[in-house]
Curated annotation (Swiss-Prot):
Pfam families linked to this entry: HATPase_c_3 (PF13589), HSP90 (PF00183)
Record keywords, A-Z: ATP-binding, Chaperone, Cytoplasm, Nucleotide-binding, Stress response
Domain-level remarks: The TPR repeat-binding motif mediates interaction with TPR repeat-containing proteins.
Name the UniProt record assigns to this protein: Heat shock protein 82
Biased composition (Acidic residues): 243-253
UniProt source species: Zea mays
Lineage of producing organism: Eukaryota, Viridiplantae, Streptophyta, Embryophyta, Tracheophyta
UniProt xrefs under HAMAP family: HSP90 (MF_00505)
């Protein structure tokens, strides 16, 4: 617990605490920035109240005495125009003193910083505050002072209070109204926010944002009635406020006589609790009876999202196993979608309408972590625990059905091109993670993939469409992986494939490497990387082509040996290429090793296994283009004098250039730059002796070579 200043006030001990720095910044942002949608504060506070009620109801399943202090589970709203306060009361689990200090001020939630950064960058809206775990502080959108009175079964009643001036107080409450159990949040509204004391406004807000909360939400309403009474009955009627109307209806004769007496009108003010949310759980109703607006309202109350959902799947499974479920796909991915420290809490699990938990990892796989919704089972035991969940066969069947229905929903989204573009932009990584992890559904998920290609232009293509465009005689699906579309679309690896008119898919998402490693084939056709060795094209069966290839190999055999000797263990072998048309050379990786892109990804892993990296990334093959002028000139020089210093320099320069064009990174960019500078000096006829001492492993190009080979010849 944080350190505090302690003083006595009215016999009760009051402690003052400082807000944690990030929370102080957040409060300052909320208070000093103008937001048009301040109304979301009520949704956030009701949502928190609902969570507290969920907790006590779950605790009561194992020990009924937990609800003895307040058996009824409710949320109450009390507007008080006289004091300009709005109170939100719940009979939930309540908070201990330690909870109050930690949860409301001294320990920042993981999302505090992210929320402020997203707000400042304009990437999110203040109404998303609940998704970042700091919804309580939205109270300061409408209030300049907030008081939280709370009672937990394991502690005394305490009052938390703050005007958001950098600190808050916590007082042991012995004199105030005793709650029994639960929390009462009192908002002292700003003068320009008094609309939130109006019954109509509060009813509208609950219907808009919190209609489908599982607990009754009551509003303390004021009713003014005007009635006529005779003078001599005024006193008697005042005593019988509740019975008066009944007596008048029952006795018509008496009413006729009363007309002769003098009447007078009086106003009667009465108060009563009115339940605002009377809808039964939406998942119990038939899908055809529910409007899109009702689904949207339920989705927003379930998730605290401010946008409508992108898609919904409402279904029930009947037979040996029975459960009902509603699943939603949001319009955008949450900021912490792949945060491994965060527990999945997007699917709420109910058993016979009783909320059990919302972070049941066994209910849905990690790759579907973005799907939100509810599952209500009649077959699971009410007292199910996390330990028994893992072995529960019913849950495994539910999980299998949820995955199946999610995939169906994704295909339904794919029927609308614009909607699917939004979906794919937000959640394509999840689909690819599913391909990597879910072997049973891998083939189905492959149909959801979309890629740019050498023939798709600005559009993307599916694997299915790619297959329909395959050239006659083409046996495989070709792809290239890389850092970006720009980095791969002019890659030397594509030269021969483009010349033959074969389409190549651009896989430029880091996770594509993992997905394609598992997918391996589609529709009976192998997925073949354009950057790995062993690329076979259909004309290799042509006898004449084979003969030409053998002749070229023989002619460049000596140069291949020279290059291998110069490069040593930097490459595994040097061969004549069949895949490049214009470029002088390229570097390919082994069929089962990492691609250049995968090597880049693995180097970026902070906790990578260095020994594995060395093993997987060392197998490079240099392929040289026998039709390229540079290679032909290099062959002549090597044959004339294999110890020619210019040959070594040119080979090293070609190797380092090939590293870059093939998607690898340079281990020593300074040496590469120095080599380029020396080639420039050579081309410009700058005397080498005037330059600084050269690096030992980069011998200067001799004068004979300099005269023989100007830069334009090398080009």
């Amino acid at each position: 617990m944080a350190s505090a200043d302690v003083h006595m006030a009215g016999g009760a001990e009051t402690e003052t605490f400082a807000f944690q720095a990030e929370i102080n910044q957040l409060l300052s942002l909320i208070i000093n920035t103008f937001y048009s949608n301040k109304e979301i504060f009520l949704r956030e506070l009701i949502s928190n109240a609902s969570d507290a009620l969920d907790k006590i109801r779950f605790e009561s399943l194992t020990d009924k005495s937990n609800v003895n202090a307040q058996p009824e589970l409710f949320i109450r709203l009390v507007p008080d125009k006289a004091s300009k306060t709005l109170s939100i009361i719940d009979s939930g689990v309540g908070m201990t003193k330690s909870d109050l200090v930690n949860n409301l001020g001294t320990i920042a939630r993981s999302g505090t910083k992210e929320f402020m950064e997203a707000l400042a960058a304009g990437a999110t809206d203040v109404s998303m505050i609940g998704q970042f775990g700091v919804g309580f502080y939205s109270a300061y959108l409408v209030a300049d002072r907030v008081m939280v009175t709370t009672k937990h079964n394991d502690d005394e009643q305490y009052v938390w209070e703050s005007q958001a001036g950098g600190s808050f107080t916590v007082t042991h409450d012995t004199t105030g109204e005793q709650l029994g159990r639960g929390t009462k949040i009192t908002l002292f509204l700003k003068d320009d926010q008094l609309e939130y004391l109006e019954e109509r406004r509060l009813k509208d807000l609950v219907k808009k944002h919190s209609e489908f909360i599982s607990y009754p939400i009551y509003l303390w309403t004021e009713k003014t009635t005007e009635k006529e009474i005779s003078d001599d009955e005024e006193e008697e009627d005042n005593k019988k406020e509740e019975e008066g109307d009944v007596e008048e209806v029952d006795d018509e004769d008496k009413d006729t006589k009363d007309k002769s007496k003098k009447k007078k009108k009086v106003k009667e003010v009465s108060h009563e609790w009115v339940q605002i949310n009377k809808q039964k759980p939406i998942w119990l109703r038939k899908p055809e009876e529910i409007t899109r607006d009702e689904y949207a309202s339920f989705y927003k109350s379930l998730t605290n999202d401010w946008e409508d959902h992108l898609a919904v799947k409402h279904f029930s499974v009947e037979g040996q196993l029975e459960f009902k479920a509603i699943l939603f796909v949001p319009r955008r991915a949450p900021f912490d979608l792949f945060d491994t420290r965060k527990k999945l809490n997007n699917i709420k699990l109910y058993v016979r309408r009783v909320f059990i938990m919302d972070n049941c990892e066994e209910l849905i796989p990690e790759w579907l972590g973005f799907v939100k919704g509810v599952v209500d089972s009649d077959d699971l035991p009410l007292n199910i625990s996390r330990e028994t969940l893992q072995q529960n066969k019913i849950l495994k069947v539910i999980r299998k059905n949820l995955v199946k229905k999610c995939i169906e929903m994704f295909f339904e989204i794919a029927e609308n091109k614009d909607d699917y573009a939004k979906f794919y932009d937000a959640f394509s990584k999840n689909i690819k993670l599913g391909i990597h992890e879910d072997s049973q559904n891998r083939a189905k998920l492959a149909d959801l993939l979309r890629y740019h290609s050498t023939k798709s232009g600005d559009e993307t293509t599916s694997l299915k469409d790619y297959v329909t465009r395959m050239k006659e005689g083409q046996k495989d699906i070709y792809y290239i992986t890389g850092e970006s579309r720009k980095a791969v679309e002019n890659s030397p690896f594509l030269e021969r494939l483009k010349k033959k008119g074969y389409e190549v898919l651009f896989m430029v998402d880091a996770i594509d490497e993992y997905a394609v490693g598992q997918l391996k084939e589609y529709d009976g056709k192998k997925l073949v990387s354009a950057t790995k060795e062993g690329l076979k094209l259909d004309d290799e069966d042509d006898e004449e082509a084979k003969k030409r290839r053998e002749e070229r190999k023989k002619r460049f055999e000596e140069l291949c040996k020279v290059i291998k000797d110069i490069l040593g263990d930097r490459v595994e072998k040097v061969v004549v290429s069949d895949r490049i048309v214009d470029s002088p050379c390229c570097l390919v990786t082994g069929e089962y090793g990492w691609t250049a892109n995968m090597e880049r990804i693995m180097k970026a892993q902070a906790l990578r296994d260095s020994s594995m990296s060395a093993y997987m990334s060392s197998k490079k093959t240099m392929e040289i283009n026998p039709d390229n002028g540079i290679m032909e000139e290099l062959r002549k020089r090597a044959e004339a004098d294999r110890n020619d210093k210019s040959v070594k320099d040119l080979v090293l320069l070609l190797f380092e250039t090939a590293l870059l064009t093939s998607g690898f990174s340079l281990d020593d960019p300074n040496t590469f730059a120095a080599r380029i500078h020396r080639m420039l000096k050579l081309g410009l006829n700058i005397d080498e002796d005037a330059a600084a001492d050269e690096d030992a492993d980069m011998p200067a190009l001799d004068e004979g070579a300099a005269e023989e080979s100007k830069m334009e010849e090398v080009d």
